[in-house]
């Protein structure tokens, strides 16, 4: 007797099987890549940040004052090296107390940068993994949306170390160093470092020099709108 012809599987089943196979291959590939990344990160990458943030302000622009004919002190000259930066403190406790003598970075400016650059700054531990993987996938699939993977902590690390190498290990080093920085310093100290080292266009670095350059004001004199404008410059520092 002749054997009856084998029934072909429905088209939907074949498609489902193909999709599941591709999914499993993708999961296995991601697992292998993630495992390799972790091995590389923990064995080959220097995740330390040598810079002491408490000493960082000593390397900034020095302002020289002279006494005029009326006996008042006025700015005579600013002395700086490669980077024109003036350090200003960020003290959230003084802001909350309503300290009238506080002349540091205003809350509106700090909040504007967090809102634009890193909404999860207060809750993450140096790295926003969702954004990081989104940026990684965007490198391969070129989505219409742009993914900024770096957190404020990671950007502070980049400004501190000046690590601009375009190699596979740079992002890994940045992530490891950001995690390390979060274990050593408070969020306020990290934010203060970031706001004082960020490039703001036209050779200015940090929010104090940027406030002087763009608005002719001290940083504590900025209005809410001016704070928002400064924060938006980070998206286009040649503004």
Q: What is the predicted role of each segment?
A:
Residues 1-239:
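Juxtamembrane regions of bacterial inner-membrane/periplasmic proteins
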């Amino acid at each position: 007797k002749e054997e009856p012809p084998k029934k072909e599987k429905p088209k939907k089943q074949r498609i489902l099987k193909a999709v599941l196979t591709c999914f499993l291959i993708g999961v296995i590939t991601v697992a292998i890549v993630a495992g390799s990344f972790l091995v590389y990160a923990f064995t080959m990458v220097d995740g330390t940040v040598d810079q002491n943030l408490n000493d960082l302000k000593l390397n900034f622009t020095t302002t020289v004052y002279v006494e005029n004919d009326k006996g008042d002190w006025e700015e005579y000259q600013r002395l700086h090296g490669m980077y024109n930066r003036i350090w200003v403190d960020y003290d959230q406790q003084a802001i909350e107390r309503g300290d009238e003598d506080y002349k540091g970075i205003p809350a509106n400016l700090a909040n504007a940068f967090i809102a634009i650059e890193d909404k999860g700054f207060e809750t993450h531990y140096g790295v926003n993994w969702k954004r990081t993987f989104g940026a990684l996938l965007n490198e391969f699939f070129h989505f219409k949306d742009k993914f900024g993977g770096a957190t404020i902590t990671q950007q502070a690390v980049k400004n501190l170390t000046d690590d601009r190498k375009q190699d596979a290990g740079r992002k890994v080093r940045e992530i490891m160093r950001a995690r390390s920085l979060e274990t050593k310093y408070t969020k306020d100290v990290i934010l203060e470092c970031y706001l004082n080292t960020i490039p703001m266009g036209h050779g200015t670095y940090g929010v104090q020099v940027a406030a002087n350059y763009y608005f002719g004001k001290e940083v504590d004199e900025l209005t809410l709108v001016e704070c928002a404008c400064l924060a938006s410059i980070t998206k286009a520092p040649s503004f």
